[in-house]
Each structure stands twice: as C-alpha cells, then as structure tokens.
C-alpha cells in the first residue's frame, strides 16, 4: 500500500547536541545528599543522576531547559510548523527531501519565526510557498537552538525536582536503572513538572 501521512502533522523531536553543563551543580546535589564536599567517590554516579533527572524533567514537561540543539522532524510541510519543545532562541535551518529524494534547504529569508511562550511557529512570508516534498516519514527537518540562555532563568521547580530525583535514585540505586520513582514521590515531582508545563503554555 502507498504511504499515507498522518492527518495531524506533529513533530518528533531529537537531541542533536546535548547540553554542556548540568541542570544543578555537583556541589548543589552533594549538599542536598548531605555528603561531605571532600568526598569524591560518588561524583561520577551523582553526575549521571543529575543528567538522568534533567532528561526526565525535560521529557515530562515537554520543554528544553538547558541550552541544546534539537531537530524537529515532520512528515510534510503545513502552513505553520510548530516547534513545541522550547524556548527557541534560533532556528538554524529548515531542510527537506524534495520529490526526487534530494536534500534541500529552505532559504531563511523566505521564512518568518514567531514565538509564543515556549512554542515557536515557522511560516512562509507572503509571496512564498512551502516546496513539495517526498512522500515519506520525516521528510522535513528543522534544526534549532533551544533552552534558557542563562542558568539564572531555569524554572525553580525544575531545580527542586532535580534535587528530589537525585536523592531518590541515590538512595535507591535499583530504581536508577529503570528511571522510575516511587508513587508517593511521583505526586510531588509531577506537581512541580505540571507547574513548569503550565508556566510554559501560559
């Protein structure tokens, strides 16, 4: 059967370049764990827990907190392309596979990017239209820079949730492997993540 695109042109988002730093510092996490700053035996493990917590929070909240490069992939062009995992600072490129399967780039000067909270919208300027694409999954790819420009802008709820998750997984290493959290703790973390989500959607 011929390939048919989904009715709703939603993006799948992948990380191209992950964040350089940590959502909370190693010293911050060790302080919350009540570990002596001179004790370094678990530094590698704690750092990994911080990264896991950051991934969990960003995925659940549907936003990018730390600065990173993302790629949103669509099955086709639609009048407006929605980049839902923001905040978006810069759109690097809009690329697509043409009807012959060759990779092409939409000229940046033909597009307009507008931002609403953590969502960025891309549309063609008057006088221009989106080109035809190959009928295939992920025919369109938008690469963009996302995340807060300064650590001082990180949502406080995200920092608090990260500390809670790091403590929980540090105390229960068997749960770290699956990235799961206890039900009672889940309510607290979910409440914090919901606040981030509500703030993002405004």
Please describe what each predicted stretch is.
Residues 1-202:
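Divalent metal-cofactor coordination and adjacent catalytic microenvironments
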């Amino acid at each position: 059967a011929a390939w048919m695109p989904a009715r709703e042109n939603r993006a799948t988002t992948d990380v191209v370049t992950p964040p350089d730093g940590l959502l909370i510092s190693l010293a911050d996490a060790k302080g919350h764990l009540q570990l002596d700053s001179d004790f370094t035996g678990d530094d590698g493990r704690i750092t990994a827990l911080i990264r896991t917590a950051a991934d969990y929070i960003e995925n659940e909240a549907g936003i990018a907190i730390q600065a990173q490069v993302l790629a949103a992939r669509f099955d086709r062009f639609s009048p407006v392309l929605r980049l839902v995992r923001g905040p978006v600072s810069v759109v690097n490129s809009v690329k697509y596979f043409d009807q012959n399967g060759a990779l092409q780039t939409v000229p940046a000067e033909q597009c307009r990017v507008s931002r609403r909270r953590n969502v960025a919208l891309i549309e063609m300027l008057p006088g221009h239209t989106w080109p035809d694409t190959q009928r295939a999954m992920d025919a369109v790819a938008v690469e963009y820079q996302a995340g807060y420009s300064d650590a001082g802008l990180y949502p406080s709820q995200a920092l608090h949730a990260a500390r809670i998750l790091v403590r929980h997984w540090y105390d229960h290493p068997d749960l770290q492997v699956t990235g799961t959290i206890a039900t009672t703790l889940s309510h607290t973390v979910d409440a914090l993540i919901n606040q981030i989500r509500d703030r993002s959607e405004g």
